[in-house]
């Protein structure tokens, strides 16, 4: 009886899971060639995938959840997916270069999603890009609500001006990363001090910063640099994104599970420098910490001890290491100043030698990871080609040996023919002089094979 109840419960759970998958998939449309003509009437969030792509298969359940969530909240954005290998011409038209590629299509515009492949991040991207490019903030209450909701956002304060046109141009390019708002001077919080109008501000890290055209240069470049919080928990994706800012990244490489003084101290030092020395270093440095050294080891092609501090130049793969432990904030500030004045020598880079080293390192890492994860698969992948090459080499060697033997047989046969001709000539000369006497026959030389038989 107990077994029957367990079996019934198991079947019920399986049925629920299957139904849930069917329901989720029902809100994601499979797109075909007709999508090109019909898409302009709606806003579409599309996953361009390939059936054989492993990352695409990992994204599929998340994508189904995105479709279900967007439908449940009544979003005007439709969610779909397209096999980019079957409809390659359409995928090429939208600029698909790899798989999976997520794009939001709004009218004639196509926006690439480059963030983490999580449900919440994808949905936030869809809401941000599908809405107005510049969102108005009509009241202080709305302003405060946006401050609580977004960790980083930009605000234009003022009326029509050339600065506003630049702001709109920057927003059209960078809306895929952050939010852009506009407000009147009366709506801005009282603690904000503006020396001149119009102005562009960024609100983050529980404070604000004002754009200065003379000090900060191009507005789009400034927004691209300031769209990150001053201190971040880093991962590989964030480091890749920071490569566009031109900033150096000061990292405390720690083990977050380790609560010893060495690990917590380095993290606190970096946080304090990021907070207290922002005016000195924020134009050139981004601060943060990373849990574990696996990614950093791959990036540096070296084994870093944990905990440690490393400064990365993600634009050219250079890095800076200190030959001693950083014990306090003063040590870290001195390290940064030495990097800025060129006292500390950069390591790594993207030279030809480093690129060759990278190829060898990546190949070695791939082989090691395969053997660690699946030794049998590694033996098959690398043993089979080696076996084929060995057989080919053996075949070439034996073919040369047989050729030599055939050549030797040819030389032996040639000499036998010459001997036979000489014997026949001697017979003809002896027959007239002997007058019919019997001449003993000369035994012909034996073939090489006959000699072997004897």
From Swiss-Prot:
Its EC number is 5.3.4.1. One of its GO terms (molecular function) is protein-disulfide reductase activity. It is a single-pass membrane protein. The keyword Phosphoprotein does not apply. The chain crosses the membrane at residues 376-396. SUPFAM superfamilies: Thioredoxin-like. The active site is at 53 (nucleophile), 56 (nucleophile). Residues 397-454 are cytoplasmic. It catalyses: Catalyzes the rearrangement of -S-S- bonds in proteins. Residues 444-454 have a biased composition (Basic and acidic residues). Residues 1-24 form the signal peptide. Belongs to the protein disulfide isomerase family. This is Protein disulfide-isomerase TMX3. It comes from Homo sapiens (Human).
